[in-house]
Amino acid sequence: MALKLNPVTTFPSTRSLNNFSSRSPRTFLMAASTFSSTSTKEAEAKEVTWTTKRGAYASDPFHAPTGSWEIFKSLGRLGLRDVLISHLKPVEKCWQPQDFLPEPESDGFEEQVKELRARAKELPDDYFVVLVGDMITEEALPTYQTMLNTLDGVRDETGASLTPWAIWTRAWTAEENRHGDLLNKYLYLSGRVDMRQIEKTIQYLIGSGMDPKTENNPYLGFIYTSFQERATFISHGNTARLAKDHGDMKLAQICGIIAADEKRHETAYTKIVEKLFEIDPDGTVLALADMMRKKISMPAHLMYDGEDDNLFDNYSSVAQRIGDTAKDYADILEFLVGRWKVDAFTGLSGEGNKAQDFVCGLPARIRKLEERAAGRAKQTSKSVPFSWIFSRELVL
């Protein structure tokens, strides 16, 4: 799952975590929680302080509404099972990376590789930095499956559970796994990038994990994945368009087929949240507002190559400059608010009405902030080296 969005100011929230700005695995997280002889539930409710070399913050768990576990169990048993399964494809009907790559068993393999490399020579360095960043983000798939399995009421309890939620998570992971495989092999064959530096970055990223601030809460978790899959669909679609603009129709096809997968997955996750709004509009709008106040953290925000502590920000800046990133954070939020018809709900609690007003008014507030940030960025452009392209420099 890739996501490259403009930085957004965090709006205050009594439930939000203080901003965690670590970008590098040089920053180690240490859980300093005190567990006594209290029950498991009491221990889980205790405040946990995470200490880093750049500061500390305390977690204040946002609890899902009472009965949410039962809601998710019933969703899995009832109609949502068919909804989830309908957005998966049988393995035998899925494309595989080899469908788009030179055939190693063929006598024409070397010629096919030469043709791929000839097309790749026409692509600029900044495009390859974006493509590499997308691939690295996709390759951190173990982290994303782990995150889904932290969510209460939907996690895979055995590793091979036959609940609808567990089946979905494993099948989603299996489909996503092809994305990193395909882009990795393409980049290897292109000869345009430093594969060892890329491989180091992948290892660092998986080892660092991620903190999406979903706090084991399935409401927050599926709002987060809806946002991320929408961003990923847009990103890969733009990468396909840019490849086409540079004349590489094969690479455009590769990025386009990945984008199509992401669109299916986006649809599935947004339907889950849509169903939550139908069953529990108050709890869901409160969760949406909470997630937006904390802001959506990027899956690869701890990206590091052993050299650049600001690698993710620099990669994101290049993506924004060449037009690969989603236009802004506000576009995705506005799309989801419309998709879920958040402004149409009535009969909410007082807190629910406040959350509804906050979420519906947020895109306009974000755009104003982003316009100011874009103006400042134009005045402070600089060049930085990227190890992925043999330390050649690019303008941010």
From Swiss-Prot:
Fe cation 1 binds at E138, E176, H179, E262. Its EC number is 1.14.19.2. Fe cation 2 binds at E176, E229, E262, H265. Pathway: Lipid metabolism; fatty acid metabolism. InterPro entries: FADS-2_CS, Fatty_acid_desaturase-2, Ferritin-like_SF, RNR-like. GO terms for biological process: fatty acid biosynthetic process. Its main location: plastid. Keywords: Chloroplast, Fatty acid biosynthesis, Fatty acid metabolism, Iron, Lipid biosynthesis, Lipid metabolism, Metal-binding, Oxidoreductase, Plastid, Transit peptide. Residues 1-32 form a transit peptide. Signal peptide: none annotated. Homodimer. Converts stearoyl-ACP to oleoyl-ACP by introduction of a cis double bond between carbons 9 and 10 of the acyl chain. This is Stearoyl-[acyl-carrier-protein] 9-desaturase, chloroplastic. It comes from Linum usitatissimum.
